[in-house]
Amino acid sequence: MRILKKILIGSRNLLLLLFVSSLLAVVAYKFIPVYYTPLMFIRVYEQVRDSKPIKLEHKWMPLKQIAQPLAQAVVASEDNLFLDHDGFDMIQIQKARADAEKGKRVRGASTISQQTAKNVFLWPGRTYLRKGIEAYFTVLIEWIWGKERIMEVYLNSIEMGDGIYGAEAVAQAHFKKPAYKLT
């Protein structure tokens, strides 16, 4: 019984530590730019592993320095209900589930909020564990950050090509101009 009690206390303490540290990280990123994400480190590792040159282009820009049409285009193409939901588009989730049950190709139903949670706090992958943790972080960022901050972090952390992350890096790499000049 002593060992079981120690295991239970240790498990409780670990869960409490994970909960508190996740809250602290989300609160910190409400105010601090997200300069690097787990995905960036994973991609650099893959480049090294595959003996490719390391490419990591990323420059944080405040939302007001990113062209409004870019944000509008992202919402239109990725999550047209972004301003109307609390992080989850239940209709798209149900459609994706129905398609999967019919044996159709699995399609994404992740919102901008879910993608931001994944990009900033997690790793790429398609496991139920990662999706569960993603849902937890999605609730936290919706609650603590709000839509404007979620959009700002999304536009600065999204992978937009091989080694290119965020609106400013893609604007420079593909259009040779700053993100605020995109139309």
What does each model-found stretch correspond to?
Residues 2-182:
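Juxtamembrane regions of bacterial inner-membrane/periplasmic proteins
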